[in-house]
């Protein structure tokens, strides 16, 4: 499901114009990004948390030059689903949908 699909579904269920839903959704995404950039996690009760995960410093490798590269400690954004969200997914009877990659050159 893509963002456009979500907007369409919400519009159908609520009667709110798609444009208004898109603005609200984009504003939500922007606020989540801003909060994480400022180091503040976002908690949505019953859904999950948008958090920062710390990645330790490590030595990587530039394979083109065959040189060791130091990767400093850093944070990455992550999503931690709420317990009830995880439980609902576990109990669902849906089969795992495999996404097939399409080669654009073939079409």
Show which residues each predicted segment covers.
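Strongly charged
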Residues: 1-107
């Amino acid at each position: 499901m893509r963002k456009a699909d979500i907007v369409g579904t919400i519009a159908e269920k609520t009667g709110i114009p798609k444009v208004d839903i898109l603005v609200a959704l984009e504003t939500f995404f922007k606020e989540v990004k801003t909060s994480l950039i400022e180091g503040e996690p976002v908690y949505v009760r019953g859904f999950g948390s948008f958090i920062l995960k710390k990645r330790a410093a490590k030595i990587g490798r530039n394979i083109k030059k065959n040189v060791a590269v130091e990767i400093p400690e850093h944070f990455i954004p992550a999503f931690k689903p709420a317990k009830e969200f995880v439980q609902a997914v576990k109990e669902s009877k849906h089969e795992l949908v495999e996404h097939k990659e399409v080669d654009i050159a073939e079409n």
